[in-house]
Amino acid sequence: MSNIRHALTVKREDDFAAWYQAVIAEADLAEESGVRGCMVIKPWGYGIWERIQRLLDDRIKATGHENVYFPIFIPLSNFEREAEHVEGFAKEMAVVTHHRLIGDGEGGLIPDPEAKLEEPLVVRPTSETIFGDAMARWIQSWRDLPLLTNQWANVVRWEMRTRMFLRTSEFLWQEGHTAHATAEEAKEHTLTMLEVYRAHAEEDLALPVIAGEKPENERFPGAVETWSIEAMMQDGKALQAGTSHYLGTNFSEAANIKFQDREGGEKYCHTTSWGVSTRMIGGVIMTHGDDDGLKVPPRIAPYQVVILPMLRDKPEDDALLAYCEDLRGKLITESAMGEPVRVLLDKKPGKAAAKRWNWVRKGAPIVIEVGGRDMENGVVSLLRRDELWNEETGKPAFQAPTPAQLTDEIASMLDSIQAGMFGTAQTWRNANVMSGCTSFEQLRDHYSDGKKHVGWVEVQWSKPTGQELEKVVEKLKDLKLTIRNVPMDTPAPTGSCIFTGKPAVEWIYVAKAY
């Protein structure tokens, strides 16, 4: 292992935060923009988002939802109707107050004092309130329910400390909003969408997650219940990768979303909302990346196979290109994971080794080099991103299949890469969860022994509320810890709460988090 020369100069073990930024740069995913806290998502990064979007959109539509689009501007009065909701977002809201600019007489521009809006407009931080207005118009009777909608959009939350893909002032996401006749139906739908997120994360992104309910202090502003999927990054921190909220009638009462039931009575709807964002890409980086850059699971890779002809600006280049074109033509007729194999023939000029490492850093699942000798021998030089190195020689672990062999095996190879990435991440996650913690002192010692990657701790607690919960939160805050969620389908605890000493009623995960 010591004689392997990795592609990145910054190593995960040395500086995880710097390594994360290096992967984004070297994989050419995104860059900082001229607007503080906002990023430019570049073609490879946006291609990954498009794959995530397509796969998740199919799952959302399979559960009966239809896509809509609402304005990015929301009247301030919409938020004022829901006090708890606006309090949760007030410090992050960007507000438009004028509709015109004028010259300042010195070559600059200023808002025109005569063009002040009658009512300020909030730049969308989330859309419960504006969806609520529409639901109040669209829903009249029980026949209009359930109303199942989803929106793909950008949102703005003015963050003070930003990090690309994890926390930016503007980001891309989907947000679902639904209305139901009863609490039971709405709660069931909340969990249905949580399961959609779990399946998407694990099956498409190869991210092992824990699904569960958030504690009272971590609920979405205005929600009755908030559920999340939590993933463990390679530094042991938790990443909240998606949330699903049961909102009760809180937003319905604020927006007057009512329906006439079968008996002719008038009732408030029970609503839900749920969302995931480009934060998922940050999760992919920190779960699967290594000291050679990004590794993209095949299901979300814009290109699953990249073919690199070793062109030398010689007459034989034409024959080599034809050989590569023929290989590409055969591969794209094959199906893998229910879709045609996505193949790029990279004909850009450049040295073979430089182009290879460019695609290794980007995380393309399979990189194929084809030179004149490969063509003469009727083979290709294949490199799997998940099996990059020959441990004994310290050199790239090239394989040499024939085009026919590759065509026959491409689907199973991509399946193997996808399954292997999930398995590796799941094994690592499970190995870094501490169970059997029976006291707060034991928890404190676990996070105070100087280890870099201490993972999560599973503990029993009594589900305190109010001031008692606030004391727990403060004790954890001193250790830079938070309660992640209450995992679903766990056996009933038999011990005592490590925070209050009372009989435990639930298991929870505690961790440092992004």
Curated annotation (Swiss-Prot):
<keyword id="KW-0030">Aminoacyl-tRNA synthetase</keyword>
<dbReference type="InterPro" id="IPR016061">
    <property type="entry name" value="Pro-tRNA_ligase_II_C"/>
</dbReference>
<keyword id="KW-0436">Ligase</keyword>
<comment type="similarity">
    <text>Belongs to the class-II aminoacyl-tRNA synthetase family. ProS type 3 subfamily.</text>
</comment>
<dbReference type="InterPro" id="IPR017449">
    <property type="entry name" value="Pro-tRNA_synth_II"/>
</dbReference>
<dbReference type="InterPro" id="IPR045864">
    <property type="entry name" value="aa-tRNA-synth_II/BPL/LPL"/>
</dbReference>
<protein>
    <recommendedName>
        <fullName>Proline--tRNA ligase</fullName>
        <ecNumber>6.1.1.15</ecNumber>
    </recommendedName>
</protein>
<dbReference type="InterPro" id="IPR006195">
    <property type="entry name" value="aa-tRNA-synth_II"/>
</dbReference>
<dbReference type="Pfam" id="PF00587">
    <property type="entry name" value="tRNA-synt_2b"/>
</dbReference>
<keyword id="KW-0067">ATP-binding</keyword>
<keyword id="KW-0648">Protein biosynthesis</keyword>
<dbReference type="InterPro" id="IPR036621">
    <property type="entry name" value="Anticodon-bd_dom_sf"/>
</dbReference>
<comment type="subunit">
    <text>Homodimer.</text>
</comment>
<dbReference type="InterPro" id="IPR004154">
    <property type="entry name" value="Anticodon-bd"/>
</dbReference>
<dbReference type="GO" id="GO:0005737">
    <property type="term" value="C:cytoplasm"/>
</dbReference>
<dbReference type="InterPro" id="IPR004499">
    <property type="entry name" value="Pro-tRNA-ligase_IIa_arc-type"/>
</dbReference>
<dbReference type="InterPro" id="IPR033721">
    <property type="entry name" value="ProRS_core_arch_euk"/>
</dbReference>
<dbReference type="GO" id="GO:0005524">
    <property type="term" value="F:ATP binding"/>
</dbReference>
<keyword id="KW-0963">Cytoplasm</keyword>
<dbReference type="GO" id="GO:0004827">
    <property type="term" value="F:proline-tRNA ligase activity"/>
</dbReference>
<dbReference type="Pfam" id="PF03129">
    <property type="entry name" value="HGTP_anticodon"/>
</dbReference>
<dbReference type="InterPro" id="IPR002314">
    <property type="entry name" value="aa-tRNA-synt_IIb"/>
</dbReference>
<dbReference type="GO" id="GO:0006433">
    <property type="term" value="P:prolyl-tRNA aminoacylation"/>
</dbReference>
<dbReference type="GO" id="GO:0017101">
    <property type="term" value="C:aminoacyl-tRNA synthetase multienzyme complex"/>
</dbReference>
<keyword id="KW-0547">Nucleotide-binding</keyword>
<comment type="function">
    <text>Catalyzes the attachment of proline to tRNA(Pro) in a two-step reaction: proline is first activated by ATP to form Pro-AMP and then transferred to the acceptor end of tRNA(Pro).</text>
</comment>
